[in-house]
Amino acid sequence: MIIVITGTPGVGKTTVSLLLSQRLGLEYLHVSTFVIERKLYRSYDELRSSFEIDDEEVAKELNRYLSERKNVVLETVYPSLVDNADKVVVLRKHPKVLYDELKKRGWNDIKVIENVEAEIIGYVAQEANEWFKETCEIDVTNLSPEEVVNRILGNICDKPVDWLDLPDVQDLLLALDKIIS
């Protein structure tokens, strides 16, 4: 069974993926670590403190790796790197809560704002929905990691989230715009 856990940085992918893999007795794979260990990146972006990957090369190597294994919980911000999955879960988090989480990590404003804006517009969720026939979206904002795992195992999904419908998120967007202006 290949389970993909995806979402913007800061939504809890690592914690949930590790917990899920332990509960199911499946291998855990962090795609970013996979990329770094195999040097599947083009360069390092100092401003964003992140590696720029070669999508095609990563997808090829990742899918070759997955073809040799049948029981993996895979964590990634790039769901389209995976050709086949038995279950795809998109974790979502209220943008204000996500903003606070990313700031706590000590990330610079540009990196924080880009990731919060990606969550607001549902960038990762949209990519997952375009790439896979079925996805399960879960708003993790007020859930513990254990509750999220229980929802995954129980196949309890939320309706797709549209953060732009919320006035406080619109206010947050305006505030973020002022920071980068």
Swiss-Prot record:
The keyword rRNA processing applies. It catalyses: AMP + ATP = 2 ADP; ATP + H2O = ADP + phosphate + H(+). InterPro entries: Adenyl_kinase_AK6, P-loop_NTPase. It is an enzyme of class 2 (transferase). Transmembrane segments: none annotated. The keyword Transferase applies. Residues 104-114 are annotated as: LID. Gene3D superfamilies: P-loop containing nucleotide triphosphate hydrolases (3.40.50.300). ATP binds at G10, G12, K13, T14, T15, R105. Broad-specificity nucleoside monophosphate (NMP) kinase that catalyzes the reversible transfer of the terminal phosphate group between nucleoside triphosphates and monophosphates. Also has ATPase activity. Involved in the late maturation steps of the 30S ribosomal particles, specifically 16S rRNA maturation. While NMP activity is not required for ribosome maturation, ATPase activity is. Associates transiently with small ribosomal subunit protein uS11. ATP hydrolysis breaks the interaction with uS11. Belongs to the adenylate kinase family. AK6 subfamily. This is Putative adenylate kinase. It comes from Metallosphaera sedula (strain ATCC 51363 / DSM 5348 / JCM 9185 / NBRC 15509 / TH2). The lineage of its organism: Archaea, Thermoproteota, Thermoprotei, Sulfolobales, Sulfolobaceae.
